Amino acid sequence: MKSTLKRLDTVHEKLSTAVRNTNSNLYSKRPAENEWSIAEVVQHLCLVEERVTEALQKGLEGESRKVGFLKKLIPMRIVSIRFKKFQAPKMVTPTNLPPMDEILTNYDRARARLKQFCVECGSERLKTISVKHPFMGDIDGVAAVSMLNFHEERHYKQIREILNKLEATDKH
């Protein structure tokens, strides 16, 4: 679990730094009508992290359930690959975007809660928790935490793409 939490910290720091270094007039600007702004991406990440932490906590309160062997073979790294665009479920679709500092503070808080939960729970107990992923179905708690790392990596790449598009548009 320590290595998973360390990877979470690494990608979180990269993403947070990229967002903090973003020109404020680009932060909430969409590169195209049907594409998210950087603000929307960060809000989405915060919402996802909060939902996963809530699901893990509920799973801990419930009866222990192990995820099937075949499900454990699905690599969570697949989440970071951006060859396919997914529609975010409504509950994690960003709305009412706060300013940059507030979104980043909320995101840091959500990460701190997740990490605290993981440390208190431990990886052996997390393996007995089953949570429902909207696209992959039931995954265990360790896979859910690992998935967050790759989900954040996916959106870090998206933020870089958004910045490239917006900066190219601003030059013209």
Region spans (language model):
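Hydrophobic packing residues in well-ordered alpha-helices of helical domains and bundles
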Residues: 8, 38, 103-107, 145-148
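Structural signal for well-ordered, non-membrane alpha-helices
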Residues: 12-20, 49-53, 57, 111-122, ...
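Absolute protein N-terminus
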Residues: 1-4
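Short, contiguous alpha-helical
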Residues: 30-77, 126-172
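Short hydrophobic/aromatic segments of transmembrane alpha-helices and their interfaces
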Residues: 9-10, 24, 108, 127, ...
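Long, hydrophobic N-terminal alpha-helical segment
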Residues: 8-15, 19-45
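Acidic/histidine-rich alpha-helical segments that form the ligand environment
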Residues: 7, 75-126
